[in-house]
């Protein structure tokens, strides 16, 4: 019965996301990744180098580019506790949406969500953008399956411009029904 009920998996999925929020967003020492992401936005605005250490702001190095500053912008302008909370919830919601779009039977989609829930929780407690990278790749796959290469390539380009992992999406070229449209729309984006 659990694998036939979106309500149960939705409560579990977003419940774990809320636990991650409570464990990290209100404890400044626990949201270092969010501070790195926020730094990308503010350093871009201030035209500062993105790939140098900022030990007074956070305790690691940034690996994200200028494009990412646009993604994090709505969260970066908020107080840390609120921006971090909404960042975690937005990433979780995006992945939930992407998995729900998969062309699988309902019980299989729920199974994927159930199996992925632990990894979601782990990544959410670290405020990782990898949650959305996976959502972008799943979304690209779904759009390829629907014959909408232009939307698939948008997801791939966003993934590629934010984190190099997005390059994996280029493998979907081989599954595209209209390969020329895939190439041209990818170049246009």
Can you say where each PLM-predicted feature lies in the sequence?
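Short acidic/glycine- and proline-prone juxtamembrane loop motifs at membrane-interface regions
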Residues: 124-133
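TM-lumen/periplasm interface segments of multi-pass membrane proteins
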Residues: 2-99, 103, 122
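Membrane-interface alpha helices of multi-pass inner-membrane proteins
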Residues: 150-174
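Residue-level signature of the transmembrane alpha-helical core
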Residues: 88-89, 112-115, 139-140, 154-161, ...
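Transmembrane-helix signature of polytopic, membrane-embedded enzymes
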Residues: 99-117
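Membrane-interface alpha-helices at helix entry/exit sites of multi-pass transporters
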Residues: 82-86, 151, 181-186
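Membrane-interface transmembrane helices that cradle and orient dolichyl/undecaprenyl
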Residues: 138-151
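Perimembrane helix-loop-helix junctions
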Residues: 167-189
């Amino acid at each position: 019965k659990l694998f036939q009920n979106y309500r149960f998996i939705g409560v579990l999925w977003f419940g774990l996301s809320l636990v991650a929020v409570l464990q990290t967003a209100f404890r400044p020492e626990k949201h270092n990744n969010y501070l790195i992401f926020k730094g990308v936005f503010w350093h871009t605005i201030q035209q500062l180098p993105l790939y140098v250490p900022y030990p007074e702001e956070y305790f690691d190095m940034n690996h994200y580019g200028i494009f990412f500053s646009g993604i994090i912008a709505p969260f970066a302008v908020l107080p840390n506790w609120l921006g971090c909370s909404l960042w975690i919830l937005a990433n979780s919601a995006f992945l939930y949406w992407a998995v729900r779009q998969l062309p699988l039977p309902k019980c299989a989609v729920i199974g994927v969500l159930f199996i992925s829930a632990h990894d979601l929780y782990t990544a959410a407690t670290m405020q990782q953008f990898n949650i959305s990278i996976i959502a972008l790749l799943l979304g690209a796959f779904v759009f390829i399956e629907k014959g909408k290469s232009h939307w698939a390539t948008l997801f791939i380009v966003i993934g590629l411009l934010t984190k190099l992992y997005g390059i994996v999406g280029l493998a979907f070229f081989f599954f595209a029904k209209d390969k020329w449209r895939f190439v041209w729309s990818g170049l246009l984006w």
